[in-house]
């Protein structure tokens, strides 16, 4: 299908929806459905109209230049034509992006899990820094950051930690954070001043509801036990901690942060739903990847995606070859927008190239 035909179909669809909304013959259910579809199309139509108007303006200005006898008016038209032609590629890009199919999970909240990798205590401290970085980023975006679990160490590091982040566009922004994050710095305990390299793994899962994943109660093994602290000592006298095993997949979720067994089970189930939904999603994506590749990086969670080098004050995202010398702003203040916006733009560019949308 040519772009012109596709464009005309979208415009006609928008006009039909507008006529239906103004017709006054819809029941409440139909009105809600059509209103939603109309709202989804509206920003696309606005971009298309700006693009079409620019083309009309180019034709008009070219005509003025070809026929106008007044040199001053002709000069003004030439300047305006130059500006419009320079702006046209940006309008084209906006239209192409608006026409790309939206990813089904982009509107969802996200569960973020950070785990210390290689590097012992230093890796655990780095994992804690990353987790706190995402907390600050969420604060900047006015998102809700709800702690789900933390397994900490005696020196203040995190073996692993997870949180539910809720708000507008959470998963769309955070989905590219999944992967191995590496840090290069001199540990406080290092007497010889040698730079150590350690790592942490970040996993970002779209929040899943019961409607997204079907779980049979008979497929769950639920164990309860006493919660323990960083040193392994028991911190609760009742069996408030919960371990849930999904037998068919072998996925295990443990939760002990709450004093209430009921609350721990609820949090564990929330994480379990997200992990099972993610398993299904990964399987589907692997099947799609056999025919096409439109994702920034490999999508493999064992892929090293970013390095934080403290001696150089440098943060490098290896998937898009982006280097920023703002390590303190990024980690201490959660200023991730520049990295994330570049990742989103790169992903959109790959999708556009794959979609073969032609003007």
From Swiss-Prot:
SMART domains: PCRF. It holds the Pfam family PCRF. InterPro entries: PCRF, Pep_chain_release_fac_I, Pep_chain_release_fac_I_sf, Prokaryotic/Mito_RF, RF-1. One of its GO terms (molecular function) is translation release factor activity, codon specific. It is found in: Cytoplasm. Peptide chain release factor 1 directs the termination of translation in response to the peptide chain termination codons UAG and UAA. This is Peptide chain release factor 1. It comes from Orientia tsutsugamushi (strain Ikeda) (Rickettsia tsutsugamushi).
């Amino acid at each position: 299908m040519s772009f012109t035909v596709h464009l005309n179909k979208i415009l006609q669809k928008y006009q039909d929806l507008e006529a239906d909304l103004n017709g006054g013959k819809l029941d409440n259910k139909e009105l809600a459905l059509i209103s939603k579809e109309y709202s989804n199309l509206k920003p696309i139509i606005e971009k298309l109209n700006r693009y079409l108007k620019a083309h009309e303006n180019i034709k008009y200005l070219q005509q003025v230049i070809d026929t106008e006898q007044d040199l001053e008016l002709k000069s003004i038209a030439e300047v305006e034509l130059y500006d419009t032609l320079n702006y046209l590629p940006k309008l084209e890009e906006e239209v192409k992006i608006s026409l790309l199919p939206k990813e089904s999970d982009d509107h969802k909240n996200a569960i973020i899990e950070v785990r210390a990798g290689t590097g012992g205590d230093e890796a655990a401290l780095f994992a804690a820094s990353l987790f706190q970085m995402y907390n600050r980023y969420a604060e900047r975006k006015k998102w809700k950051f709800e702690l789900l679990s933390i397994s900490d160490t005696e020196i203040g590091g995190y073996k692993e930690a997870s949180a539910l982040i809720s708000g507008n566009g959470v998963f769309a922004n955070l989905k590219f954070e999944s992967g191995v994050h590496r840090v290069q710095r001199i540990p406080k305990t290092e007497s010889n001043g040698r730079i150590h390299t350690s790592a942490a793994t970040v996993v970002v899962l779209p929040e899943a509801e019961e409607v997204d994943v079907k779980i049979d109660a008979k497929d769950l093994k639920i164990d309860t036990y006493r919660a323990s602290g960083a040193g392994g000592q028991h911190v609760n006298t009742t069996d408030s901690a919960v371990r849930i095993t999904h037998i068919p997949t072998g996925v295990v979720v443990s939760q002990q942060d709450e004093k209430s067994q009921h609350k721990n089970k609820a949090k564990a189930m929330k994480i379990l739903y997200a992990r099972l939904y993610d398993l299904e999603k990964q399987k589907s994506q692997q099947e799609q990847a056999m025919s096409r590749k439109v994702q920034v990086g490999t999508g493999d969670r064992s892929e090293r995606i970013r390095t934080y080098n403290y001696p150089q004050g440098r943060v490098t995202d290896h998937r898009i070859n982006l280097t920023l010398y703002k390590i303190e702003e990024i980690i201490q203040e959660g200023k991730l927008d520049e990295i994330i916006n570049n990742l989103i733009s790169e992903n959109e560019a790959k999708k556009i190239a794959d979609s073969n949308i032609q003007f």
